[in-house]
Amino acid sequence: VSEQPRRGRKPAKPYRRPKKDPVRILAFDALRAVDERDAYANLVLPPLLRKAREKGDFDARDAALATELVYGTLRRQGTYDAVIAACVDRPLREVDPPVLDVLSLGAHQLLGTRIPSHAAVSATVELARVVLGDGRAKFVNAVLRKVAQDDLDGWIEKVAPPYDEDPEDHLAVVHSHPRWVVSALWDSLGGGRAGIEELLAADNERPRVTLVARPGRATTEELLREEAAEPGRWSPYAVRLAEGGEPGAVEAVREGRAGVQDEGSQLVALALANAPLEGPDARWLDGCAGPGGKAALLGALAAERGAALLASEKQPHRAGLVAKALAGNPGPYQVIAADGTRPPWRPGSFDRVLVDVPCTGLGALRRRPEARWRRRPEDLDNFAPLQRALLRTALDSVRVGGVVGYATCSPHLAETRAVVADVLKQYPDAELIDARPLLPGVDQLGEGPDIQLWPHLHGTDAMYLALIRKTAD
């Protein structure tokens, strides 16, 4: 005879094991790697997806959802933090990071996707049971039910300060950027509210993959045979893959004849290659060559003119990536591991020199959304001496009549015009040349003579380029 429950007490519900959702577990694992190891999602996610596909757990739709959950959560982290903070009874710093990652994943499903609210809450609570345990899953459930009470616009009205009272803080919450980044980008861009809002919104868009057909090795016609591929907007060597396109599936990419390269990066190389020279044009230098994208394009362009490229990179493992990118280059080239501030070559050895210097990366936030939360204003002070030293080396390395290209993937004025202006004070034998005519057809390049590209205007990363000619000894 079965034992009867005591009178007046409801029978306990049988314990139900949590349902394991491989998509959300993978997304959580990726976010934990980004948080714990300072990893980048674009490096962490592909191997996780590949492993899941090999196990048979994933199809293409699963991979697309996992990718959206990871990148969407990282891009809107600032907004979601403000919403979650309004729904908990403690400061966010007192919420365990794994719990906050689960809450952020849930907030993105509720506020940033079309997943129905009940499904988003239920799936995220099940995830919490798997990765956090039943106790903390109850906390997740309570918080997400509060988040689900309004949509994104409604929450922004509640948690963002009015624009008229604090424009930068308002934009920081609405567009999910640290306040100091909003301020810096606004200073660089100039103009009123519309422009900065468009730029910040573009940072939160998922960019399509752009390929470069390396001259003499691949053609855009070949790359355009990929399904739904389109010509690039500006570069004659650029092809954009379809949404969700996998570059590893493209034969020319696998063979190294083409590569993944943002169109802004291609334009930097093209502008330097197109700059008029006085005298010979036989020796080119990429002084900060890792990981090799610009070096591979420069090497191919140099080969078309019978010029040789020296690609120098300080870190040996990155120099190895440069060598891999240049393998098969149709013209002469050499890759070395060397300190660009103490180079082994003689002064005046080169006709064209590119230095794409280490920087904060604030121009590539749409590709690396987590970078906006890692960078600090003091990073500018850390980069400044190196940026100036590398530009000085470049100017010492170019011959009279030759051209130096100073490039960054940051539009911050402290990393762009301030560096160039400071260094040129020490070089009366060097002058800025107008880079804008060297990119025919590319509009909205500013007042010159330097170039600043923008995601919302050009569909590229926010690359900066100044071209400098050595005029006399």
Identify the meaning behind each predicted range.
Residues 1-473:
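S-adenosylmethionine
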